Structure formats: structure tokens, C-alpha cells
Amino acid sequence: MIVIPAIDLKDGQCVRLRQGLMEDTTVFSSNPIEMATQWVEQGARRLHLVDLNGAFEGRPVNSTSITEIVSAFPDLPVQIGGGIRNIKIANTYIEAGVSYLIIGTMAVTDSEFVSELCREFPNKVIVGLDANNGFVATKGWVQKTNLNVVDLSKKFEQDGINSIIYTDIARDGMMQGMNVEAIVNLAKQISIPIIASGGITNIGDIIRLLTEVHFGIMGVITGRAIYEGTLDFKQAQQLCDEN
């Protein structure tokens, strides 16, 4: 299992939101590439970048910061989400060197878009599903749906997506611990690898996930915990490597 540092971009700055609310923002750095360098120097094997403005506006907004990071670390896999709403945008990111495209809202509202992306960019598409009490939310978590996250995930098994990022909205940015039960429940019922996200607080969450890693949990995304220091990134990755 790999530990993936999150770099959430808003107005060119590195921030974290609480429960996906744009008005509840903490700025951790005004220099995203400096932030990326810090995690790379600590041994990050992948970076998770999110264009928060893009997620809300439906188009790339922080693409300059994203391409700068990708260019600075050409051998490092980078996954990007937020505002990827058509093939042209996806192609621009792939040509810039992005390794994986994260599709959130469009995966829920237009499943054919995911199928098309998978045909165009094999093994480079990650579906990001944000859920609250087992039901999917879209449009930067603003819009709740009546779609069950397990049922929706199963629909992507035939497309050949790389993985699913499962984020528990109720826990994200709240530093209350991960909802491991919900993550494992999803992982058990689908064949697609899972990247867990939302609520990681300390090394205890890593330990709990590692006991369930055989169900197909390939990675965990962490943001606020590594920025506020309640989780030591190097220690977390070392623990994963030893198990």
C-alpha cells in the first residue's frame, strides 16, 4: 500500500477544505511546487493533485501549477482531478505528463464519458467517488444523490478503470479518523483496486487499513494530517512497506 500526499489547489495556493466546503479553507502553502518537492524528498511515490476551482467551475483553473509540478518530477506518477469534463482537457493533461486522470462528477452523470476515456487512455482513468452514508455526492460534494456507492462502482468494472478513490465526505478534513468499515465494505464487493481517502488522522488509521489491505486497498490519500503533523509521512510509508 502506498501513502499518497494530497496537494489541493485553490487560487494557485495549496489548501485543505473541511468536508469539501470552499468557504472552510486552510492555506498551507502559497507555493505548490515547493510543497510537492517536500513530499518527493520524503519519498512520495505518487502525488494526488486536485484543482478545487476546476471541480467547482467544470474547467481547469490551476493547470499552470499542475503542469509545473509534473514537469519538475517527470518520473513521478501524478494523478489529477477537478474540472476534467471532456476528452480535450484529458488529452492536454496526458500530453503534459500526467499519469492518471481522476473523474468525479462526470463519472456519476455520464458513465459513457468514463468508457470513452478508458478506450482513449487505457489504465490511466481513476474514478473518484465521494460518498456520505453510502450515497454518492457530486459537483464538489455540493449535490447529494440517491446512488449507492457500491452499485455505482460495479458499473465501472467492465470499463477497465485503473482504480477507485473512495472519499468519505463526513470524515474528510475533520481529523476524526477514517471510516475503514465503509472502505472495506466497498473493496470486498468489487474487483477494482481502492484508494482510500477522507479522515486519516494518525498512524492508527494506517495500521487499521493495513489489516484489510488484502481486500484490494492499494493506497491511501492523506492531506490535513501530514500538513498539521499528526501523521508522519515517512513513518507511514515505511510501515506500509514493512507489511
UniProtKB/Swiss-Prot annotation:
- Gene3D superfamilies per record: Aldolase class I (3.20.20.70)
Q: Name one GO molecular function term.
A: 1-(5-phosphoribosyl)-5-[(5-phosphoribosylamino)methylideneamino]imidazole-4-carboxamide isomerase activity
* Key words, A-Z: Amino-acid biosynthesis, Cytoplasm, Histidine biosynthesis, Isomerase
User: What does the record give as the active site?
Assistant: 8, 130
The UniProt entry's GO CC annotations, sorted and at most eight, read:
cytoplasm
* CDD domains to which the protein is assigned, alphabetical: HisA (cd04732)
Give the catalysed reaction(s), semicolon-separated.
Answer: 1-(5-phospho-beta-D-ribosyl)-5-[(5-phospho-beta-D-ribosylamino)methylideneamino]imidazole-4-carboxamide = 5-[(5-phospho-1-deoxy-D-ribulos-1-ylimino)methylamino]-1-(5-phospho-beta-D-ribosyl)imidazole-4-carboxamide
InterPro entries associated with the record: Aldolase_TIM, His_biosynth, HisA_bact_arch, Isoase_HisA-like, Isoase_HisA-like_bact, RibuloseP-bd_barrel
State its Enzyme Commission number(s). Answer: 5.3.1.16
Pathway the protein takes part in? Amino-acid biosynthesis; L-histidine biosynthesis; L-histidine from 5-phospho-alpha-D-ribose 1-diphosphate: step 4/9
The UniProt entry, under SUPFAM superfamilies, shows: Ribulose-phoshate binding barrel
Q: What class of enzyme is it?
A: isomerase
Q: Which Pfam families match?
A: His_biosynth (PF00977)
Q: Which residues form the signal peptide?
A: none
Tell where it localizes.
Answer: Cytoplasm
For this chain's UniProt record, which GO biological process terms are given? Answer: L-histidine biosynthetic process; L-tryptophan biosynthetic process
- NCBIfam families under this entry? 1-(5-phosphoribosyl)-5-[(5-phosphoribosylamino)methylideneamino]imidazole-4-carboxamide isomerase, PRK13585.1
PANTHER family recorded:
1-(5-PHOSPHORIBOSYL)-5-[(5-PHOSPHORIBOSYLAMINO)METHYLIDENEAMINO] IMIDAZOLE-4-CARBOXAMIDE ISOMERASE
What family is it from? Belongs to the HisA/HisF family.
What protein name does the entry list?
1-(5-phosphoribosyl)-5-[(5-phosphoribosylamino)methylideneamino] imidazole-4-carboxamide isomerase
Q: Which organism is it from?
A: Vesicomyosocius okutanii subsp. Calyptogena okutanii (strain HA)
Source organism lineage?
Answer: Bacteria, Pseudomonadati, Pseudomonadota, Gammaproteobacteria, Candidatus Pseudothioglobaceae
